[in-house]
Swiss-Prot record:
<dbReference type="GO" id="GO:0005634">
    <property type="term" value="C:nucleus"/>
</dbReference>
<keyword id="KW-0539">Nucleus</keyword>
<dbReference type="InterPro" id="IPR002100">
    <property type="entry name" value="TF_MADSbox"/>
</dbReference>
<keyword id="KW-0238">DNA-binding</keyword>
<protein>
    <recommendedName>
        <fullName>Agamous-like MADS-box protein AGL90</fullName>
    </recommendedName>
</protein>
<comment type="function">
    <text>Probable transcription factor.</text>
</comment>
<dbReference type="GO" id="GO:0046983">
    <property type="term" value="F:protein dimerization activity"/>
</dbReference>
<comment type="subunit">
    <text>Interacts with AGL62.</text>
</comment>
<keyword id="KW-0175">Coiled coil</keyword>
<dbReference type="GO" id="GO:0000987">
    <property type="term" value="F:cis-regulatory region sequence-specific DNA binding"/>
</dbReference>
<keyword id="KW-0804">Transcription</keyword>
<dbReference type="GO" id="GO:0045944">
    <property type="term" value="P:positive regulation of transcription by RNA polymerase II"/>
</dbReference>
<dbReference type="Pfam" id="PF00319">
    <property type="entry name" value="SRF-TF"/>
</dbReference>
<dbReference type="GO" id="GO:0000981">
    <property type="term" value="F:DNA-binding transcription factor activity, RNA polymerase II-specific"/>
</dbReference>
<keyword id="KW-0805">Transcription regulation</keyword>
<feature type="domain" description="MADS-box">
    <location>
        <begin position="1"/>
        <end position="59"/>
    </location>
</feature>
<dbReference type="InterPro" id="IPR033897">
    <property type="entry name" value="SRF-like_MADS-box"/>
</dbReference>
Amino acid sequence: MKKVKLSLIANERSRKTSFMKRKNGIFKKLHELSTLCGVQACALIYSPFIPVPESWPSREGAKKVASKFLEMPRTARTRKMMDQETHLMERITKAKEQLKNLAAENRELQVRRFMFDCVEGKMSQYRYDAKDLQDLLSCMNLYLDQLNGRIESIKENGESLLSSVSPFPTRIGVDEIGDESFSDSPIHSTTRVVDTPNATNPHVLAGDMTPFLDADANANMNQVQYQAPNNLFNQIQREFYNINLNLNLNLNSNQYLNQQQSFMNPMVEQHMNHVGGRESIPFVDRNYYNYNQLPAVDLASTSYMPSTTDVYDPYINNNL
């Protein structure tokens, strides 16, 4: 809604229309006030647009309220009474008080900036007098008092604060990170070492032989540390060799007898490092377990092409 400019309406017809509308609005508000709040109120309006002064709620009601008001003491009547001059003087007083407060805030900011610039060696940039130096000294003393109070507080509570902090554990496993880590209670750390069994580890091992737990084992992994045995490579190669000896190639013995024999011999010989003394297939791209590496087969002596699905995986074929 557009704000109305408080000035005399130049057009007489518009002024009369506005008068009638606002007069009815005042009478409506007085009726709501007296009905909702249970107070006695009256209104008396003089206007050049009507020959007789108009009163609310009626002439008798207005006289009754006016008589009751005149019976009150003068101090009680004039306590909240205000004319135009009194209203303007009150507004001027409030504005002067606000100006005084803003001037004090600006002066404090100027002195604080002057102090920080003096610390940085920029004192020569200012033109100051004795009053400025006195204000600067007061500001510096205020900051020094705050610093000294802070130092005394740290000296008094320093030992108790340091003693309440629990020391860090010297050796921990996998830390459990959760909401409990931010509680006030001290943290108790335990480490549980689990030795890897002689059988093949069911968890997947990365290229650097660091074990990773699967999703099922993650449910209770609070500070568990796994240690692999020193002979893990020999155990894997031995398991690889034993399973390859019992591998069923599902070939027709009548049709592929020679091909099966020529395919099995190189595979067995390549992984008999601890039996036959031959070298294993060299590692390619950190492939420590010979994944997806075909055996060296003499294609000139056989017509059978080995399938890539027959390559042994120690963890996939463990459940066969």
